[in-house]
């Protein structure tokens, strides 16, 4: 994994590559578009406030705008972690290591460059980045940073919900969801990202671990992962506790719970509408797995059926009473039409064959 960085300013890059465009305001960079990929290119930064681009910092030390161009030696000081501060010169074939990043790689450490508190206050998302690196690489975060993360984690509330949403996807959709979940809990950051679930988090730990193991397995075999499915998993405990998911479910209360939980989470993570619709569909289909009837055949052909069924399977880790329903649906799902009618009749539903 590498980034491309240069001493050319964004405008100069734009002139060299006509197939490029400048993006971002807080942190300007350039996307150079090729037929099969987009190459993201950044400019060396500095701490200087003298040049035209400048760097803007608020009273807490948060970097609001970072477009102050500099040299490679200045840029490396702006990096967050030592393992993230290695430069490679493609012309000389050399790795340039200013802060002992190679040593940290060997020791499997995630170490901040400079004062961890200052670096976190500059950008609280570095907390999530540290956790992501530790989860992805099976590294340890430096001990001195743990106390600071515990003290400063509340600053994540000050980050835009859209940015937090993107970071959550990186944590849970990159093949290390199980480890991300464990480290987020260790550093008590899970409760910041999902405050409305934190009170039942421990109770549903087996559900989360089972679900994230399956998520990581799907990632490793190249299966597509839906962001909506991950959020449906992460928020389900609250829906489960607020609603009686059974044959005698109160649908009015169920729908109200779904609207309330998704609305409150949007304040923290701005989930795009297409995925909130997916989340709601997966949840609203859950009672149907325990209520077979005339609409069961049509339901099994629903666009969201497979996702809802996969979700239903994961629920078994905390709802052992679903065993018979899961076995019935597993057989029903792959049966031909005649067999499906027999299975429905076995549940006391009298259906005639066409």
Q: Language-model features: where?
A:
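Catalytic cores of the polymerase beta-like nucleotidyltransferase superfamily
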Residues: 1-354
